[in-house]
């Protein structure tokens, strides 16, 4: 996948209006990243000085260690993958954005490692499914698949976990550290959104089918990874269904942005239906027998009934609207 020569033609590009807009956005990702660089050593040291080293019961400490060791290794994978992207992306603007991400991911990895050391718990080995998600993305030679795996799957999962753990205020140092990560990861997702539509538009029918199969395999492995983390997540008060709801909303936003850039992007592709059915099978909306769970998952895939993704997302949206209404009423007085 690596290039053995310099891309001397990177400036000989005649952009369409859409391509020029994407280029400006990617260049902006780079410059915003430069403006918002933060020193991980100083930030973590200041937070520990303010709150003291993390103090948690053994059960919560073990759970946080398991969850964020997955994040830590994901950051290392992201570091390696963003370096690969920097080499193979040809447009200058995309190369700049990917270069900015390399620096971000290096910082994310060493700061998370330092936090886990402060937590005082040896990070456990990765579970099979988490390792599979990272390995699939690292191993593929397809730029489109790397962007899908890194920018739009691994980064989205990380953002989802960061948001929910921060909302629950599980541990004060982590609660104040995670917004730095979230801000960076949101930019990284933006790079994938700008680059991937053009790559998909150039694919043959067979290549799109292969891409869809990879997409489903990757997402299925990610959900199985979440299932593996379920005991640890519930130990710190995180309902995996809430993560699915946040992830579903983020993915819906990404799909909407994709359709803006690539109008023929399908509204409800088959892999999305299968993914919804798998989520219903593993995280059912109600306690039922195994047979009923399978039948419910099939109905969700056929869009005959809403599944856990839609139901939990609607619940979360309703709670957010209720909180905003209460805030407005309280503010009025």
Residue ranges and their predicted role:
Residues 42-45, 136, 170:
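Short linear motifs at secondary-structure transitions and domain/linker junctions
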């Amino acid at each position: 996948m690596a290039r053995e020569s310099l891309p001397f033609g990177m400036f000989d590009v005649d952009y369409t209006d859409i391509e020029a807009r994407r280029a400006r956005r990617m260049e902006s990702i780079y410059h915003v990243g430069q403006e918002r660089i933060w020193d991980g050593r100083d930030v973590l040291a200041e937070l520990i000085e303010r709150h003291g080293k993390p103090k948690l019961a053994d059960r919560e400490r073990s759970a946080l260690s398991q969850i964020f060791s997955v994040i830590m290794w994901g950051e290392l994978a992201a570091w390696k993958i963003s370096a690969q992207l920097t080499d193979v992306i040809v447009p200058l603007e995309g190369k700049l954005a990917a270069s900015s991400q390399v620096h971000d991911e290096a910082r994310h990895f060493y700061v998370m490692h330092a936090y886990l050391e402060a937590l005082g718990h040896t990070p456990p080995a990765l579970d099979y499914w988490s390792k599979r998600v990272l390995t699939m993305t690292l191993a593929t030679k397809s730029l489109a698949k790397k962007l899908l795996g890194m920018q739009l799957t691994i980064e989205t999962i990380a953002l989802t976990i960061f948001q929910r753990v921060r909302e629950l205020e599980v541990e004060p140092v982590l609660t104040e550290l995670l917004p730095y990560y979230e801000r960076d990861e949101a930019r990284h997702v933006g790079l994938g959104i700008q680059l991937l539509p053009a790559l998909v538009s150039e694919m043959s029918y067979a290549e799109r089918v292969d891409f869809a199969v990879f997409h489903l395999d990757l997402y299925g492995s990610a959900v199985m990874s979440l299932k593996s983390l379920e005991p640890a997540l519930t130990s710190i008060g995180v309902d995996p269904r809430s993560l699915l709801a946040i992830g579903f909303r983020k993915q819906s936003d990404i799909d909407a942005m994709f359709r803006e850039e690539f109008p023929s992007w399908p509204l409800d592709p088959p892999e999305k239906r299968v993914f919804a059915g798998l989520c219903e099978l593993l995280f059912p909306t109600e306690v039922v027998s195994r047979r009923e769970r399978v039948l419910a998952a099939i109905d969700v895939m056929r869009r005959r009934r809403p599944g856990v993704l839609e139901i939990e997302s609607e619940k979360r949206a309703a709670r957010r609207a209720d909180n905003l209404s209460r805030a407005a009423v309280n503010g009025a007085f």
